[in-house]
Amino acid sequence: MTIAEASKKYEITADTLRYYEKIGLLPNVHRKTNGIRDYNEEDCRWIEFIKCMRDAGIEIEALIKYVTLFYQGDETREARRQILAEQREKLFIKMSKIEKSLERLNYK
C-alpha cells in the first residue's frame, strides 16, 4: 500500500505518516526499489494502533516509548503493559472531566 493509499484509508495525512516514521513510531517501513513506501500488514496494524491511541489523546512520547520497547522484545512486556496502564488511567481521568463538563452543559 502506498503512502497515498494509507493516508486515504486511515484518514491521516501523508505528512503525518512520514513524521511517525521519522520519530520511530513506524519503524522499518518497507520501500520499493524506487524508494516509494510500501506499507505491509504489520505497518497497517501499527498505523491503526497509533491512530486509535492518538484519537484518544495519548501522548506521542508514550507511544514512542511503547514502540521502542516492543521492538526490544518480550522481556519488555511488563514495561509496555505499564505504559498502557498509565495511559488508560489518564484517559479515565480525562473522561471524568469531560462527563462533568457535559453534565454542566446539559444543565444550562
Regions picked out by a protein language model, each given a short descriptive name:
Residues 55-83, 87:
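Amphipathic alpha-helical dimerization/coiled-coil segments
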Residues 76-108:
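Short, charged amphipathic alpha-helical surface segments
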Residues 49, 60-61, 70, 95-98:
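Short C-terminal domain-edge/linker segments immediately following a structured domain
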Residues 17, 25-26, 63, 69, ...:
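Generic detector of leucine side chains in alpha-helical contexts
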Residues 1-65:
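Basic helix-turn-helix/winged-helix DNA-binding cores
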